[in-house]
């Protein structure tokens, strides 16, 4: 059986590689036509997509899946409208392919340009969110990349119905239907084949899902990976912070949506203002339903908190829980963050410019914010349109991965007969 899957996946890889070549030179007009046609097709197939989703939901109920899982899996009229609108929004983004990033002239008369190009074939491995099928397919198409989509078996029917609409969009623009493929088998061995690179067909892998999925991909992949393992995000309240602003930001950073990777998991408060700032901020969080886990110093000032353990400082809760510590100013905050951070997103609330400069310069995370909530760690909020994920690595893409990050570059060098001699 595994051998059969290897053969099936090798064929998927060959088709993707073949489709990537014409897609890489497709015009902006062609790609946008395909995207808008795909959005139309999704709306036209609304009944079919909802019926497919009902099958997935019935299986989820039979398997006793958690309510949060079922919510991620569920499609309804509004969510289908949002999927179509998201695809249209990607169509309106500037086409990154062919953009001249930099150009210069050499003393010998050579003119050099650095130009954006597609990456080639992208493999996207995700779990129960059927909307990722549309988001990932559309983003890769806009950047001129072929894509192989492997969603979780729990969302197989929903993803297949959405994929069918994406293919209609490609066909409407005379682009190869194999430019967006969905893995035709649910066996997990298919993931292993993708991680091997399908014989050189896949140029990069993007995992979208929980920690165990991302850890497996990062451990086993033989091709580059754009991903983050977890979002242990910090919010630091400096002694120069405006208290009202700090209260608003802390409440939003933790409680707006607790289950996203940009939610704050640790709150650090400057020891110099702990007596005035700590109780109001923690009171707001507690009133909002958040469990407070604090260091011994925090418990002394806010007895309603539970004791924090060493494990808490390196835990991504994805829930209404926050760990809280006091630190010795910006130096203490930097030390704590650099020790425990997953290098995803950190924020500071402060009015002192030198303090903010140190925060930006001395913390090595993908996204750093000043006087703003960590929940802005999102490609849409950055003006990138949708994102395929957030990367915390240092090679190629870092932070939100949008259409621009789904490209590479090449050099075009123009001469007039120069030889090196």
UniProtKB/Swiss-Prot annotation:
It comes from the Bacteria. GO terms for molecular function: glutamate-5-semialdehyde dehydrogenase activity; NADP binding. GO terms for biological process: L-proline biosynthetic process. One of its GO terms (cellular component) is cytoplasm. PROSITE patterns: PROA. The keyword Ligase does not apply. It is an enzyme of class 1 (oxidoreductase). It is found in: Cytoplasm. Pathway: Amino-acid biosynthesis; L-proline biosynthesis; L-glutamate 5-semialdehyde from L-glutamate: step 2/2. Keywords: Amino-acid biosynthesis, Cytoplasm, NADP, Oxidoreductase, Proline biosynthesis. Its main location: cytoplasm. It catalyses: L-glutamate 5-semialdehyde + phosphate + NADP(+) = L-glutamyl 5-phosphate + NADPH + H(+). Its EC number is 1.2.1.41. InterPro entries: Ald_DH/histidinol_DH, Ald_DH_C, Ald_DH_N, Aldehyde_DH_dom, G-glutamylP_reductase_CS, Glu-5-SA_DH, GPR_dom. Catalyzes the NADPH-dependent reduction of L-glutamate 5-phosphate into L-glutamate 5-semialdehyde and phosphate. The product spontaneously undergoes cyclization to form 1-pyrroline-5-carboxylate. This is Gamma-glutamyl phosphate reductase. The lineage of its organism: Bacteria, Pseudomonadati, Pseudomonadota, Alphaproteobacteria, Hyphomicrobiales. The gene is proA.
